[in-house]
Amino acid sequence: MFSLQGYEYFLGFLLISGAVPILALTTNKLIAPKSKAGERQLTYESGMEPIGGAWIQFNIRYYMFALVFVIFDVETVFLYPWAVAFHKLGLLAFIEALVFITILVVALAYAWRKGALEWS
């Protein structure tokens, strides 16, 4: 038979982590001012009212650079623990990391060849 012994702290944590946001949102709803007119409807950013419209089109190059950055940033997140435990992992982990790095180098070469890293 399945026993829940030892899970009391986990269950307590789940209950508290669910109750805290509910309590915070309920308290905010009860004590917040109800008025939705005038100054509350204005946009406020960095202490100044914005000038002009907010709907402008950004150049696609910004998104391409951001996407390439995120891909290689995630690569670093995956490779760091491997590098820390390199001596304990053995040859198989080394080969797996080489395959991972090879895939990313191929992706970088593809992005470079397609011009994703060119600004012009």
Curated annotation (Swiss-Prot):
Identify the GO cellular component terms for this protein: NADH dehydrogenase complex; plasma membrane-derived thylakoid membrane
One protein family per Pfam: Oxidored_q4
Report the principal subcellular site: membrane
Q: Which reaction does it catalyse?
A: a plastoquinone + NADH + (n+1) H(+)(in) = a plastoquinol + NAD(+) + n H(+)(out); a plastoquinone + NADPH + (n+1) H(+)(in) = a plastoquinol + NADP(+) + n H(+)(out)
- Under the GO molecular function aspect, what terms does this record hold? NADH dehydrogenase (ubiquinone) activity; quinone binding
Taxonomy, superkingdom: Bacteria
Which of UniProt's keywords are assigned here?
Answer: Membrane, NAD, NADP, Plastoquinone, Quinone, Thylakoid, Translocase, Transmembrane, Transmembrane helix, Transport
User: Which parts of the chain span the membrane according to its record?
Assistant: 6-26, 64-84, 89-109
Gene Ontology biological process terms, A to Z? photosynthesis, light reaction
How does the record say this protein sits in the membrane?
Multi-pass membrane protein
Presence of the UniProt keyword Ligase in the record: no
The reply to whether Transmembrane figures as a keyword in the UniProt entry is: yes
Q: What's the subunit arrangement here? A: NDH-1 can be composed of about 15 different subunits; different subcomplexes with different compositions have been identified which probably have different functions.
Q: Which family does it belong to?
A: Belongs to the complex I subunit 3 family.
The molecule here is called NAD(P)H-quinone oxidoreductase subunit 3
